[in-house]
A protein has these predicted regions:
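Conserved catalytic/switch belt of AAA+ P-loop NTPases
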Residues: 136, 140, 178-217, 237-238
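Conserved C-terminal "switch" segment of AAA+ ATPases
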Residues: 101-107, 232-238, 245-307, 407-414, ...
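Walker A/P-loop
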Residues: 69-120
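Peripheral, non-AAA+ core regions of ATP-driven protein-machinery
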Residues: 339, 361-537
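AAA+/P-loop NTPase substrate/partner-engagement loops
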Residues: 100-134, 139, 201-203
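Pre-Walker A (pre-P-loop) alpha-helix and adjacent loop at the N terminus of AAA/AAA+ ATPase modules
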Residues: 37-80, 400-405
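Conserved C-terminal helix/linker of AAA+ ATPases
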Residues: 293-294, 299-329
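Conserved AAA+/SF3 P-loop NTPase catalytic/coupling segment centered on the Walker-B
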Residues: 122-132, 154-188, 195, 232-241
Length: 537
């Protein structure tokens, strides 16, 4: 009987091995066949930057990234910027550049591990966590090779795989708060501690390496590079405080043209300068450019042409429902009640914001104030409470009216005043204070404003000009829009502003200085207007 039992047991084992072997050969043949089939390389791959010189328009951002990663003490980094401007490409290149530096701690074998926060999922039971790591659970996931013996099986996550290198988390702003808190702990400890109810330090059957992992943790000494399209204030302060913040800006039309030209050259086609101009008007980032050119090149190749026509570009734009990127420019001549304000949107992108005001003297009744184009109310949560208040932009307008009354005795409530900020994007923030004050002052006194001056700054009830944020981006936006002077708060002044070419940066501390610089046909001496009525022509 024993002989028969052994015979049938060996026969069954042989049959199982034979079946597994046949299945293995069959699947390997399928896999080899699949791998032998390859399509042509897409243009998105061909046009991907292979060196920092190919990252267009991000000279300052790349310089900051190199300074943070390529020194003897590399830092954790968060890169802010709009989509398709080179954040991911720069992150991929910076590790290879750091390896070439003599004083860099990154070894030649240092790995670049990339993970996308938008698709990152984890299990609350701790049995699946591709970022931090997990422990195989024999109940939920099957026994596995060691599960029969009751031995837990640790699975390293991305933080351990990136040990000694760089962990790149794309769209880090979308990372789940629980995962983010786990990541913060790993950044502090530089190791990962796992836990399992199956682990016992007294178990003599426990393999040494598993005991070492549970007792002393998995190594996770890496440098984090996160990329996000969110604003800094939308990122949890705990992660921001541990990282150097690097900003990539939006691309200018001439930079879009350069990217388009390079992409077209890589597919072996030609295009006219006017065609490049059209592309630069309808694309705002490199990804949009490449997608548009892929379709245009497809049309040209199907029609057996070696060039892309303007009609090809226009057809793709029309069918792809591309929206023209409006480039804000200063007005051609001074206008009463129209002022060039400045704002910041997205990730440190500056924009010229035309503010227009009309004022009409009322008789027999009080005037009315109308405001359009701004956020009037805002709601936010704080300490488990929902708080609703007037927006900072609307409050800034109230400050302006009070300041004009206090300083110049302008009775704004005697006028029907309409303040409008065109553009279709609701505006918030106090930094348009001096621009709104100048526009109201101009409209009431019927005096034009210098159209070549742009301005930004908060205004107090006493007419003092307060500091604001995003000054560098605003100055560049003013220059790009055609302004030759930009007024900023004196508290934001930096000696580096003297190095800007093509635009003069003027610091001011009170609203009188602003009016003296911007209102045309106005005496340069101290102004003491007693009544708006007596001064209006």
């Amino acid at each position: 009987m024993v002989v028969l039992d052994n015979y049938y047991s060996n026969r069954n084992n042989y049959s199982k091995v034979n079946v597994i072997d046949k299945e293995n050969r069959k699947e390997m043949e399928k896999l080899i066949k699949l791998r032998s089939v390859r399509l042509t390389e897409p243009l998105t791959e061909k046009s991907r930057p292979s060196s920092f010189d190919e990252i267009i328009g991000q000279k300052e951002g790349v310089k900051a990234l190199k300074a943070a990663i390529c020194g003897p003490n590399p830092q954790h980094v968060i890169i802010y910027g709009p989509p398709g401007v080179g954040k991911t490409a720069a992150a991929r290149l910076v590790l290879e550049y750091a390896k070439s530096m003599e004083n860099s701690p990154f070894k030649k074998e240092a790995k670049f591990v990339e993970i996308d926060a938008t698709t990152l999922r984890f299990d609350e039971r701790g049995i699946a966590d591709p970022l931090i790591g997990s422990v195989h659970d024999p109940i939920y996931q099957g026994a596995g090779s060691l599960g029969v013996a009751g031995i837990p099986q640790p699975k390293p996550g991305a933080v351990t795989k990136a040990h000694g290198g760089v962990l790149f988390i794309d769209e880090i702003g979308e990372l789940h708060p629980i995962e983010l808190n786990k990541l913060l702990k790993v950044l502090e400890d530089r190791k990962v501690f796992l836990d399992s109810s199956y682990y016992s330090s007294e178990d003599p059957n426990m393999p040494t390496y598993i005991k070492e992992i549970f007792d002393n943790g998995l190594p996770a000494d890496f440098r984090l590079i996160g990329a996000t399209t969110r604003n800094p204030d939308e990122i949890i302060p705990a992660i921001r405080s541990r990282c150097v913040e690097v900003f990539f800006r939006g691309l200018k039309p001439n930079e879009i043209k350069e990217i388009a030209k390079e992409a077209i050259n890589k597919v072996g086609l030609k295009v006219s300068d006017n065609g490049l101009n059209i592309i630069s008007r309808f694309c705002s980032n490199g990804r949009e450019v490449v997608n548009l050119i892929q379709l245009c090149s497809g049309i040209a190749i199907n029609e057996e042409r070696n060039y892309i026509t303007e009609e090809d570009i226009k057809w793709v734009i029309e069918n792809g429902q591309y929206t023209e990127v409006e480039e804000k420019k200063v007005s051609k001549k001074p206008i009463v009640g129209v002022v060039n304000g400045l704002a910041v949107y997205g990730a440190n992108l500056g924009i010229l914001m035309e503010i227009e005001v009309t004022a009409r003297k009322m008789k027999g009744r009080k005037g009315e104030l109308k405001v359009s184009g701004i956020v009037e109310e805002e709601e936010f949560s704080m300490n488990n409470k929902k708080i609703k208040r007037k927006s900072t932009a609307f409050s800034s307008i109230q400050n302006v009216l009070t300041a004009l009354n206090n300083i110049y005795n302008l009775k704004c409530d005697e006028y029907d005043i309409h303040i409008n900020i065109p553009g279709g994007i609701p505006v918030d923030g106090p930094s348009a204070g001096i621009a709104i004050a100048t526009a109201i002052y101009s409209a009431i006194l019927n005096k034009p404003v210098n159209n070549k001056i742009a301005m930004t700054g908060e205004i107090s009830l006493l007419g003092m000009v307060g500091v604001i944020g995003g000054v560098n981006a605003k100055i560049l936006a003013a220059k790009s829009a055609g302004a030759n002077k930009v007024i900023i708060p004196s508290g934001n002044w930096n000696e580096n502003f003297l190095n800007y070419k093509g635009i003069k940066v003027i610091p001011v501390s009170n609203i009188k200085e602003v009016f003296n610089l911007s209102i045309l046909n106005i005496e340069k001496s101290d102004i003491n207007i007693l009544s708006a009525k007596t001064n209006k022509k």
